[in-house]
Amino acid sequence: MWRLKIGDYGTKNDPYIFSTNNFAGRQIWEFDPDAGSVEELAEVEEARLNYLKNRFNVKNSSDLLWQIQILREKKFKQTIPQVKIGDRGEEITPEIATTALRRAVNIFSALQSSHGHWPADNSGPLFFNTPMNEDGGWGLHVEGHSTMFGTVFNYICMRLLGEGPDGGENSGCTRARKWILDRGGATGIPSWGKTWLSILGVYNWSGCNPMPPEFWKLPYFLPISPGKLLCYCRLTYMPMSYFYGKRFVGPITPLVLQLREEIYIQPYDEINWSKLRHLCAKEDLFFPHTTVQNLLWDALHNLVEPVLNRWPLNKLREKSLEAAMTHIHYEDEASRYMTIGCVEKPLNMLSCWAEDPNGDYFKKHLARIGEYFWMGEDGMRVQSFGSQTWDCAFAVQALLACNLTDEIGPILMKAHDFLKTSQVTDNPPGDFESMFRHTSKGGWTFSNKDHGWPVSDCTAEALLCCLYFSMLPPEIVGEKMEPERYYDAVNCIISMQSQTGGVPAWEPRRAPSWLESLNPIEFFDEVIIEHDKVECTASALKAMTLFKKLYPKHKAKDVENFIRNAAKFIEDTQKLDGSWYGGWGICFTYGTWFAISGLVTAKKTYSNCLAIRKATDFLLKIQCEDGGWGESYRSCPNKKYIHLEGNRSNLVQTSWAMMGLIHAGQMERDPTPLHRASKLLINSQLEDGDFPQQELTGAFMGNCMLHYPTYRNIFPMWALAEYRSKFQSSKIF
């Protein structure tokens, strides 16, 4: 059976893998044919069959394979009896709230790894591997409608794995191929798909819009310099431009020739590829290209590319390809060959293979590829790159809010150790600014230290946890960090703030806003330049406020300015209905919780801040009949609040809204909405103390969703903890 291995497993005799912190937080699934008792194997099979039976109702994995493994290893058994609140006027009591909270803490503590973090799936761009929809296609994410991108990718993957093209009407390949052909064939695949199909040899490079590697030779002062782009955009098109510049095509095998016949509605040799460059299936089109943008691509394709591929300018092409590979190798080494994410990892790895199939660069990539695979009861998938630090920081805050520190000291100490071990303690190697990198010293990444890419909100949330730990007895939570490490984190956060007062995710804003209109990616939004995010700003505001209290002398003026400007940014970006748009969660519920929590730390209250009053009204207005909150992922692409179908609730979003209202002082004005929400959380708790997996709650790039299975544990526990604490202190119980 499959087993999750944590840390340096399998690395001792491998010369192609290296780490900055002894592989803390590294997660690798391995298949062991001899592992598992009869009972454990039966439990895994039951979980698999239950998912299969309910996959169109609850599409997201509950991460049961990891839970089964770790709970059996720890011999966990929930010993606290389940509690329920009746519908006939029964009220919540301190005993009921405390019991539900302890049950949640009990199981969640058992799910902690030996390294101190909470291993979990973090499924991002699921067009790599996602369950088939009922119509025979695949979506951009697990809950999304079928797209040409997802369906063509998964059809080709099935064929590469040995499935035949015609296996009967119920065959996955048969249904997928019909879906593709019924919509005009694979010529309608978006630009990223066109690139990958060209590399494979089932599409022609002349049908792709230009991605000239000369881009990497542009001077920095130009607004379209690669150094001014969003890092994800920059690092995706880096290897793509290498492949485009070389017109690289893999081996033309019999299977490749068969695929050419299977996914198009006309003979492959008769397709006019050049006319397909702007074509995109309507199912995939989220960000249409403007006329100006299409004219730009046409000019590059018809005028510039022919010149660059002829003497003497073909010498420039050769130098540009070398420059692209130099950047690729730099980014690979700086991230210990994890790269920045799952979209970039295979592109960089394939670039190294194209350069030298037997070279060390490619072998170093292979040594890290296992960290991108995750096993659940729904099978294996490619995940984003792990959310170890992000989940751990939220978990710590939730556990601390429970006010059970004396009972869970060992859990907190291990989490503290993980966060201390995971801080990035150096800048990127060499002359990192010439490689378009920003300072990283003092930051925290989304996953682990080896990843090497700090994120502003990950840094802020982890710093906040470490500051909390510094206020607790070291014999319970471990020794606090050296002050210089807090200073480094604060310096990192300050360096990210924009002139608006807002804070972007990965790097400071460097480019003008109009550059976003040149977005070539048809299914993503806000991917060309960095954008200030309300969540990043709020996280940073919370951390900086506590830091100022504990270390008032370090960069006092800079910290004060940061706090003032961040609070103003949050107030200035509020929507007319009182909400905030969340970029990393779904969506207005998520953003509004963050915004309120940030403003409150800046001494804003319901009485002195109009933004908090409007936010409170927004949250109360969208509360569901059952006392919860439930927002559809469709809010993200539509940029307006949309309820879940059937006006049903989602427990994670209910928790966000609860905490937002608690921070806004709703307890003191009218606790009834919070009583109703808490009742829903308590009554939804499962027999073992877990909470049920429901809809997706994470998001990115406006149109793609993320799956965070630990959210269902962390946020209901956190909300119940704050609810219980506030009611006890206000003597409403």
From Swiss-Prot:
PROSITE patterns: TERPENE_SYNTHASES. SUPFAM superfamilies: Terpenoid cyclases/Protein prenyltransferases. One of its GO terms (cellular component) is lipid droplet. CDD domains: SQCY_1 (cd02892). It catalyses: (S)-2,3-epoxysqualene = lupeol. Keywords: Isomerase, Repeat. The active site is at D457. Its EC number is 5.4.99.41. It is an enzyme of class 5 (isomerase). GO terms for molecular function: beta-amyrin synthase activity. PFTB repeats lie at residues 121-162, 426-468, 486-528, 563-603, 612-653, 674-715. Pfam families: SQHop_cyclase_C, SQHop_cyclase_N. One of its GO terms (biological process) is triterpenoid biosynthetic process. PANTHER family: BETA-AMYRIN SYNTHASE-RELATED (PTHR11764:SF58), TERPENE CYCLASE/MUTASE FAMILY MEMBER (PTHR11764). Belongs to the terpene cyclase/mutase family. Oxidosqualene cyclase catalyzing the conversion of 2,3-oxidosqualene (2,3-epoxysqualene) to lupeol, a pentacyclic triterpenoid with anti-inflammatory properties. This is Lupeol synthase OSC3. It comes from Citrus sinensis.
